[in-house]
Amino acid sequence: MKKKQLKPEPYMMNRELSWLKFNERVLNEAGNPRVPLAERLTFASIYQSNLDEFYMVRVGTLMDQMESSEVVRENKTNMTSKEQVKAIIDATRELDIKKAVIYEQLMGELEPQGIRIINFNKLSGKEGELLETYFDNEIAPYLSANIISKQQPFPFLQNKEIYAVALLATKGGKTKTAIIPCSNNVFKRLIDIPTRPGTFMLSEELILHFLPKLFKKYEIKEKSLLRITRNADIDTETIYDEDMDYRDAMENLVKQRKRMNPVRMEFSRKINKKLIAEICKYIHMDKNHVFMSRVPLDLSFVFAIQNYLRMQGAEKEKLFYQKRSPRMTPQLKEKESLIAQIEQKDVLLSYPFENIKSFTNLLYEAARDDSVVSIKMTLYRLAVRSQIVDALVEAAENGKEVVVLVELRARFDEESNIEYSRKLEEAGCRVIYGLSGLKVHSKLCLITRKTEKGLEYITQIGTGNYNEKTSTLYTDLSLITAKQEIGKEAAEVFACLLRGETIEETHVLLVAPKCLQNKVLDMIDDEICHAKNREEAYIGIKINSLTDKVIIEKLVEASQAGVKIEMVVRGICCLIPGIPGYTENIKIISIVGRFLEHSRIYRFGTPEREKIYIASADFMTRNTIRRVEVAAPVLDDTLRARLDEMFDTMMKDDEKGKELTSNGTYVNRRVNAEKLDSQELFYEMAYKNAEKKTI
């Protein structure tokens, strides 16, 4: 008997389609004339790299589900995996059209700035000769041409690499397929045209033009560039079943990912359908996953264009954002003991507006302070040259107990984390690797000191990674406190992790997987009670993604009870506001601006009874019940007021903030007499506060 499918609720949106709407907002910034021209190139490249990762991970997962004998349905809209993949492909084709229009606009606007990307047919005869010589001497010697035959099977295509493909014809009329890798670290991707400064040609286009030189015995019947995207959704839980070192097993899995099945293939121009079918057969690709692109298959070359523009001097500065650098927080006097100051008052750092150096300086001070007996820390994504790691190494070398939980399963950072785990172990740190079935995504650091009063704690809880690079690019919050009730509970969290367990009960912190979702639901229930008693009730949430169905349903219940709900959700949002009878008391905006919005703030209650937290967790099921996450209450009145002001400012952002409407679209909004960019305002405030030495 066929299972009856429930009708989806009118306030639910599919997760994957919501993500595509987010990436469209990124693409819109590439076409936004209010964004400096060179920065719009960055948004175009980010859009493409985001989409690559989406196909590698999300589409890869859905395609794995399609292989299952059981039909898997998404729990909010009841779409099957197959239906979702089709909807994703259809939406991607629409976005590809928009991307091509925006790319052509960008290229058109770059021309008056002296920048042109051209094809070979735009060259003069002399220029063509120069580039032919360049091809013969600098590119051709490094190319490996493959003509497919029984003796030379179809080569393995690397993920996201560009290849030239051609249909060759012999004098006797037989056809053969040829494929040539175009990516090589030896030659440049962006080739200068010597006679025309600022004019460039992409190396893959030059290779494509000179294919006849590589296949002199054949006629080139068809030619194109292609690029494939491979599934990257590896099952990291299998490493717990391996009878080998955890780190070695993880290295093996990362190698395995490079050879997984393709999920998408892109061509740079229309090409013979039979040739497409042949390539699809070779790589086991569904022809519905083939895309034709009017835009270069890899947009990372735009950063070379930006570098060229920067070298042109001051007149090109207007093409970039105004230079900004993080300020040292006025909350701390850098020449005095940071530990002593934090004992007196809590500190809240706001990145990228304030410098992460205040935290790294604290770690170095702890590494050298005789009263410090241990430092415990969770690490998820680290900078290439990490001062955080250097400080921990110094602490271990100074005889401190240093315990570090390195999450090796941080997607696409596995290899970096493996190397850092070795470095920490070699320095004498105790390194552990997370829990079976649960990623440790929390941002938690505990410094333990032995004083005359006994053991005392300094705790840091953050919303973002311990990464000096991303702290200048992402908005994040970092609370540093000497409140002992927070420190004692953080110590319990680490004790559980060291035993391979998760904490069962908390009183101050919210800790997933067992003590976060339920406590959030309780606080929403409290607001529902106030609303039902005809008292003012309020919930304010800032997160990156909202997919947790349990929390969504509870927010709908709160809206129906009359609770005012304001949300800043940067990316995926499966909740549609403004639906009569369900979500008319919910307002949701998304901010996509210069910096990646990454901080998480939870607010419950009116000012006189407000509870406010910063957290590492989004409201996604993976965060609330399948990861170790930590949210910390902000107890200092000054810091609470500062967070309230930040949240309220973001809700007023009508420069980068787009409002989610009841029909599931995002629209521009007008809130202020003059448009307000919250990120720009926060930077201005950081500069002023640093000058005044007050906050």
Annotated model-derived regions:
Residues M1-I539, E557-A561, C573-I695:
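N-terminal localization/anchoring segments of enzymes in phospholipid and broader phosphate metabolism
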Residues K549-V556:
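Glycine/threonine-rich ATP-lid/beta-loop region of ATP-binding domains
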Residues K564-V568:
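Hydrophobic alpha/beta core scaffold segments
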